[in-house]
From Swiss-Prot, chain A:
This is General vesicular transport factor p115. PROSITE patterns: ARM_REPEAT (PS50176). It is found in: Cytoplasm, Cytosol; Golgi apparatus membrane. ARM repeats lie at residues 20-60, 61-121, 123-163, 166-207, 208-253, 255-310, 311-354, 363-408, 420-459, 473-513, 518-571, 573-630. Keywords: Acetylation, Coiled coil, Cytoplasm, ER-Golgi transport, Golgi apparatus, Membrane, Phosphoprotein, Protein transport, Repeat, Transport. GO terms for cellular component: cytosol; endoplasmic reticulum; ER to Golgi transport vesicle membrane; Golgi membrane; Golgi stack; perinuclear region of cytoplasm. It comes from Rattus norvegicus. Transmembrane segments: none annotated. Homodimer. Dimerizes by parallel association of the tails, resulting in an elongated structure with two globular head domains side by side, and a long rod-like tail structure. Interacts with MIF. Interacts with GM130/GOLGA2; interaction is disrupted upon phosphorylation of GM130/GOLGA2 by CDK1 at the onset of mitosis. It is a peripheral membrane protein. The gene is Uso1. The modification N6-acetyllysine is found at residue 202. InterPro entries: ARM-like (IPR011989), ARM-type_fold (IPR016024), Armadillo (IPR000225), P115_Arm_rpt (IPR041209), Uso1_p115_C (IPR006955), Vesicle_P115 (IPR024095), Vesicle_Uso1_P115_head (IPR006953). PANTHER family: GENERAL VESICULAR TRANSPORT FACTOR P115 (PTHR10013:SF0).
UniProtKB/Swiss-Prot annotation, chain B:
It comes from Rattus norvegicus (Rat). The modification N-acetylalanine is found at residue 2. This is Ras-related protein Rab-2A. GTP binds at residues 16-21, 38, 64, 119-120, 122, 150-151. A lipid is attached at residues 211-212 (S-geranylgeranyl cysteine). The small GTPases Rab are key regulators of intracellular membrane trafficking, from the formation of transport vesicles to their fusion with membranes. Rabs cycle between active GTP-bound and inactive GDP-bound states. In their active state, drive transport of vesicular carriers from donor organelles to acceptor organelles to regulate the membrane traffic that maintains organelle identity and morphology. GO terms for molecular function: G protein activity; GDP binding; GTP binding; GTPase activity. Interacts with PRKCI. Interacts with TRIP11. Interacts (in GTP-bound form) with GARIN1B. Interacts (GTP-bound) with HOPS complex component VPS39; interaction contributes to obtaining a functional HOPS complex that promotes autophagosome-lysosome membrane fusion driven by STX17-SNAP29-VAMP8. May interact with VPS41. Prenylated. Prenylation is required for association with cellular membranes.
Amino acid sequence: MNFLRGVMGGQSAGPQHTEAETIQKLCDRVASSTLLDDRRNAVRALKSLSKKYRLEVGIQAMEHLIHVLQTDRSDSEIIAYALDTLYNIISNDEEEEVEENSTRQSEDLGSQFTEIFIKQPENVTLLLSLLEEFDFHVRWPGVRLLTSLLKQLGPPVQQIILVSPMGVSKLMDLLADSREIIRNDGVLLLQALTRSNGAIQKIVAFENAFERLLDIITEEGNSDGGIVVEDCLILLQNLLKNNNSNQNFFKEGSYIQRMKAWFEVGDENPGWSAQKVTNLHLMLQLVRVLVSPTNPPGATSSCQKAMFQCGLLQQLCTILMATGIPADILTETINTVSEVIRGCQVNQDYFASVNAPSNPPRPAIVVLLMSMVNERQPFVLRCAVLYCFQCFLYKNEKGQGEIVATLLPSTIDATGNSVSAGQLLCGGLFSTDSLSNWCAAVALAHALQGNATQKEQLLRVQLATSIGNPPVSLLQQCTNILSQGSKIQTRVGLLMLLCTWLSNCPIAVTHFLHNSANVPFLTGQIAENLGEEEQLVQGLCALLLGISIYFNDNSLENYTKEKLKQLIEKRIGKENYIEKLGFISKHELYSRASQKPQPNFPSPEYMIFDHEFTKLVKELEGVITKAIYKSSEEDKKEEEVKKTLEQHDNIVTHYKNMIREQDLQLEELKQQVSTLKCQNEQLQTAVTQQASQIQQHKDQYNLLKVQLGKDNHHQGSHSDGAQVNGIQPEEISRLREEIEELRSHQVLLQSQLAEKDTVIENLRSSQVSGMSEQALATCSPRDAEQVAELKQELSALKSQLCSQSLEITRLQTENSELQQRAETLAKSVPVEGESELVTAAKTTDVEGRLSALLQETKELKNEIKALSEERTAIQKQLDSSNSTIAILQTEKDKLYLEVTDSKKEQDDLLVLLADQDQKILSLKSKLKDLGHPVEEEDESGDQEDDDDELDDGDRDQDI
Amino acid sequence: MAYAYLFKYIIIGDTGVGKSCLLLQFTDKRFQPVHDLTMGVEFGARMITIDGKQIKLQIWDTAGQESFRSITRSYYRGAAGALLVYDITRRDTFNHLTTWLEDARQHSNSNMVIMLIGNKSDLESRREVKKEEGEAFAREHGLIFMETSAKTASNVEEAFINTAKEIYEKIQEGVFDINNEANGIKIGPQHAATNASHGGNQGGQQAGGGCC
C-alpha cells in the first residue's frame, strides 16, 4: 500500500517504473496485436495486475479495454477478462480490508474512474448490450461492473440508462435468469439502479418487478429465506418508498394480499436467526411504507382497508400478542400496527377488540399500556406503545370516549379485578418515573384531542388520594404535581396535557381558574428569571395562561379576560410574556417533533414534545399573541361586532331562506308557464295543421274538379296513359250511374216512407174518430189491412235495402280493386316510358289523375256512407211507425173490450125488463082477479113507454 | 378483486391533449380542469367487464413533453393497448400523430392495439381537426378511432372498453401469447388456477394457456 500511495503522490520511484512499463507493454499488445490469443493473454495479464496496480492499469488500460469490448464481442473469454479488469479498477469492494486512511483515497479512485468511463455514454450503452449476451462469463461480470458504476455515481449512470432505449427493461430481464447468481446480483443491480430515481422505479415496477420479487421471496421461504430475501425486500422498499404511483400499482395489483403470508410466524419456532429478524424487520417496514402518515390520505386509507380485508392486520396483531418474539421485532410490529390502524375507523375498532391470550383475557390496549408505564421495558418499546395508543385514538371519537369512560365513577369496575386503561394512565401520570408521567400525560392528551365532549367528561374524574382525605379532581391533582416542582419531563408532560385539555373548552378553563393557586403559580413561573433549562417550562406556562385568557368565557369575576390581561401587564409585562411564549417553538426539539407523528427519540432525555401538541402550539401562538396585545376596548368592540355580525347573519339566513322559498315558487311557476306554453304551441300547431289539411282538401277537391274536366278532354290524346288507365274512367262512370240508381232508389224509398207516414196519420185520425163515435168494429178490419200493407211495404223496403247494401259492398270492393290497379299502373308507367322527361310528365299527370280518381272514389264512398245513413234513418222511422201501430192495436183491443162489456150490460137490462114486464103482467092479472080498478094500466103504460125509449137507445147502440 | 385477465395500457400523445384527464375520468369519474404536468408516468387502474368476464385494466399515463420521451418509451414494450390522443382544437397535436405512431410501432410488440382518440370534443367551436380527418388517419394506419371529451365523459368509457374488447378478441383468435407477460396481458389468479385444475371445463378461450 505504501507503493500505491507513492504513485498517488505523483512521485515515481524505481520499482514501480518496471510495473508501469509492463502495463504499458500489455496495453500495446492489446491495442496492436492482430492475433486474438495474444490480445486475450494480454487482457488476462492486465486483469491479474489490476487489483494490485489499480491506478496504473486504470489510467493506461481503460481505453484499450473499452475498445476490446467494442471489437472482440465474438470471444466471450476476452470480454470476460476485460469486464473483470474494469470491475477491479472501478469497484471499491475489494479494498474493504484496507486501513481507514486509504479507503478514502480508493473511493475517490473508484469514482474518478467511473467518471472517465461514463464520460462517453456509449460505454454504458455498450455495457447494457453486453448484458444481453446469455454467456455467464459475460453477463455476470457485466452485471457486477454496472452495479459498481451505479454505486459510484448513481444519478448520471441512471440518467444514461434511462435514456438508452429499453435500458431499464433489459436489466429487468436479469430477474428472470435461471442462474441464481445472476438473478441475485441482478437484484443488487436493480437496488442501485432504483435508488432515489422515481422514473426508473416506475419502469421497473411496470416490468412486473413486484410479481417477480414476491415470487422470489415466496420461493426462498419468506422470512426464513436468506440474504436474497433481504435484498429483494430492500429493492421493494426502493420501489415503493415515497412513490405514490408505484404504491397505487402495488395495491391495485393485489400484492398487499401476498404480504400476509410473510407474517405467518409460528410460535413453535423458538430460534430467531439474525437473518430472519432482519427479513421480518424489512417486511414490517414495507407495510409501513404503504400506510405511512406522510402518504396522501386517500392512498393510505385504501391500503389500510386492504390490509384489514386480507387479514394482514389480524396477522400482525397475532404477532403482537404472541410470546417469544424478539423485542426488536415486537417494537416494529407495534409501530406497524399503529400505522395500519391510524385514522381508519374499521381497523381501530378491530384493534380495540383484540384480546391478549391471557387468563382472564385482557384487551390488547391494556396489555400494551402496562408496558408503556413499566420502567423495566425497553425505551423504544414504550415509545412504540405510546405511538400505537396515539394512532388508535387518532380521529377516533369512539375510542376516545371509551378510554375516558374507564376513568369515570359510573363505569369503574368496583371489584377491581381487571385493570382498566384509565387506571393505568392515572397510575403512569402520578408514578415516580418521569418517563411514565410524560407518556401517560401525552396519551391522555390524545384521548382529548379535538373532542370537546371528552374534555368536559374528564373534569368529572375524582381521585382518591389517601384514606381520610377527600377525593381530588384529576385536574386539581395535575396542577398540584406541577407546583411541586418535579422533573422537567414530568412538568412538560403535564403542561401539554393541561394545554390540550383547556384549549377550546371554556368550562375546563373555568375549572382551572377556580383553583385560586393556579394563576399565581403560572405568573410566578413566567415572571421568574430562571436558567435555560426552565425556559421551556416557562414557555408552556405562558401558553397555558394564554389559553386561559383566549378561551375564557368571563364566568369567574376574579379571572375575566380583562383581569388576567392586566395581571400579565403588571406582573410580567406584555413583551416579556410574548418572548416567553416564543420559547416553545424555538426549542431545538420542537421542529423535530413537528415533522412526524411517531414519537421517535434517540434517548429518553429527548422525549419532550408530542407531535399533536406542536400542531396545537402552531395554531394558538398567533391568536394568543393577538389576544394579549388587544386592549379591552378593542375586545369589547370586537364582541359587539361579533354580535352585530351574528345578527346580520341571522337576517341574512332569514333572507336566504326567503329567497330559497321564492326561488322554489318561481321554479314552479316557470314550469307551469313552460307547460302551458307547450300546450299552447301544440294546440296552435294542431290548428294550423288542420287548417292546412282543410286547405289541402279544398285544393285537392278543386284540382279534382278541374282534372275531371280535363280528363275527359285529354283522354283521347293521352293514348298511352288512357290505354293504361282507360278502365278507370269507365268504371267511374259506371259507379256514378250506380250511385244515381241508388239515389233514385232512395227517393223511392223516401216517397214510400212518406206514404207510410200518411197512412199512419190516417190511422191515428181514424182511431180518434172511432173512439168518439163508439163504432169501432168497422175500424179494426181497415186497420189490420193497413198494417198488413205497411208490413209488406216494410219487407219490400228491407229487401231493397239489403240489395242496396250488397251493391254498396260490391262497389266498395270494386273500388279497392280499382285503386290497386291504379297503383300498379302508376308503378308500371315509369318503366314503360321511353324518354325520362316524357315519362316523368306522364307519370305526374297520371299520378294527378289517379289522386283525382282516388278523391272521387272517396267522395263516392262518402255518398254511399250518406246513403247508408239515410237508410238507417228510414229504418228508424219504420220502427217508430211500427211501434205506433202496435200502440194503436192495443187501444183498439181496449175499445173492443169496452164494447163487449156494454153489450153484456144491455142484455142484462133486457132480461131484467122482461122479468119486470112479466111481474107487472102477473100483478095486473092479480089485481083484475081481486076486482081492483085497472086505471093504473095507463100509468104502467107510460112507464113502459119510457122503458121502450130506453130500449130503443140500447138497440141503436147495438146496431 | 378476482379478474379473468389483466391488460396493461399506456396513454400517449402530445402534452396538454388531456391524457391525464382521460385517465382521471375513467378511474375516478371526475374532471379536473387544471391539471399539473405529468412527470414521467402515473399509474391508474380500474375493473371492467367484457363478455361477462372481469378484466383489470392497469393504465400508465405518460408525460407528453419531449423531455420525457425517453422515459415513456420504456413503457411501450410491456403494453397490450395504447391510447394515442390528440386535441381536436390543436392541429399540431394531430400533425404529430405520425411521429407518435412510428415511435409506438418501433418500440412496442407488433400486436399492441392502438386506439386513436380525438379529445376535447366538447369544444366544438374551437375545433381545428375534423372528425373525418381523424377517421381517415385511423383507417390509413389500421387504428380504432373515437372522439372523446374527458370533461363531459363522452365516449371515455367506450374508448377504454373498446380497446379492451379488441385485445380480448385478439386473445380469442390466438394472436396474443397470453403466457408472455411482456405482452401486457396476464391471466387472473383464479382463472389460471381453475385452468390448471380442470382445464377442460374452462376450455375454449384460453385453451392455449392451461394445456401446453
